[in-house]
């Protein structure tokens, strides 16, 4: 945090929070006219739990969750749901760059004992986009094998 430059902060906030707000606003007019819509934002386990050295990313992803809850309250009466999916560590090119020791340390924090698959995240998004999820709004679905468990 102490070594993070302002431009590093600004770039991550612009990419991971400001862009999401702009995209949400851009789709609202059509959804309001249709009196139907699903907005599903991608946050992260880091936004809920934090991660050393990622103050900017954690703030941006936590901001997306807060923004989504506020928007859900604002437009919920129009049959538009707003939710988040918060992946944990998923088996992608990004996690393939981790060392064996880093993966082993992560797996000790994940009760499921494995990294997630991209399909785990995709299925969660597909569910929230479906008609079966019409009464779910303003929530974050954590897809992380139990690495982070929210209270309540």
Over which residues does each language-model region extend?
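A conserved structural motif in NAD(P)-dependent oxidoreductases
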Residues: 110-121, 132
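Short C-terminal tail/terminal secondary-structure segment
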Residues: 49-52, 126, 137-152
């Amino acid at each position: 945090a102490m070594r993070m430059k302002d431009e590093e902060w600004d770039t991550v906030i612009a990419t991971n929070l400001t862009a999401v707000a702009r995209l949400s606003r851009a789709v609202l007019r059509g959804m309001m006219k249709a009196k139907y819509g699903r907005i599903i934002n991608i946050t992260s386990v880091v936004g809920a739990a934090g991660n050393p050295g990622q103050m900017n990313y954690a703030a941006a992803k936590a901001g997306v969750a807060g923004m989504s809850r506020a928007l859900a309250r604002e437009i919920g009466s129009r049959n538009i749901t707003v939710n988040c999916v918060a992946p944990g560590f998923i088996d992608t090119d990004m996690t393939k760059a981790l060392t064996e020791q880093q993966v082993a340390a992560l797996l000790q924090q994940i009760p499921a004992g494995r990294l997630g698959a991209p399909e785990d995240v995709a299925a969660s998004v597909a569910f929230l986009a479906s008609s079966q999820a019409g009464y779910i709004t303003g929530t974050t679905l954590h897809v992380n094998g139990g690495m982070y468990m929210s209270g309540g």
